[in-house]
């Protein structure tokens, strides 16, 4: 029984370290990647994709046009 508890605790600790590593990596990449403060986020007016933030696109079709939306693809 003690062996199973020790293995479970080791598994939990390893998982926590792995998740923290990914979180730290994303935080570092945010610092490295230069972001334009003037870029458009959700519902910001746009005329082209360059008006929107990174990974966001200018909606050209649908009910609402010429707004920035996140690119899921």
UniProtKB/Swiss-Prot annotation:
Main localization, broad class: secreted
Transferase keyword on record: no
Propeptide position ranges: 21-35
Cysteines joined through disulfide linkages: 39-53, 46-58, 52-68
Any one GO molecular function term: sodium channel regulator activity
UniProt-listed InterPro entries: Huwentoxin-1
UniProt entry keywords in alphabetical sequence: Amidation, Disulfide bond, Ion channel impairing toxin, Neurotoxin, Secreted, Signal, Toxin, Voltage-gated sodium channel impairing toxin
Expression sites by tissue: Expressed by the venom gland.
UniProt keyword NADP present: no
Cellular-component GO terms for this entry: extracellular region
A Pfam cross-reference name: Toxin_12
Phenylalanine amide: residues bearing it: 72
Signal peptide start-end: 1-20
Lineage: superkingdom: Eukaryota
Localization: Secreted
Other information: Hardly affects the DUM voltage-gated potassium channels (Kv) (15.4% inhibition at 10 uM) and the DUM high-voltage-activated calcium channels (HVA Cav). Does not affect or only very weakly voltage-gated sodium channels Nav1.3/SNC3A (<10% at 15 uM), Nav1.4//SNC4A (<10% at 15 uM), Nav1.5/SNC5A (no inhibition at 15 uM), Nav1.7/SNC9A (no inhibition at 15 uM), and Nav1.8/SNC10A (no inhibition at 15 uM), HVA Cav, and Kv in rat dorsal root ganglion (DRG) neurons.
Notes on the domains: The presence of a 'disulfide through disulfide knot' structurally defines this protein as a knottin.
Protein function: Insecticidal toxin that potently and irreversibly blocks voltage-gated sodium channels (Nav) in cockroach dorsal unpaired median (DUM) neurons (IC(50)=833.7 nM). It does not change both the steady-state activation and inactivation curves, suggesting it acts as a pore blocker (possibly at Nav site 1). Does not show toxicity when intraperitoneally injected into mouse.
Family: Belongs to the neurotoxin 10 (Hwtx-1) family.
Name assigned to this protein: Mu-sparatoxin-Hv2
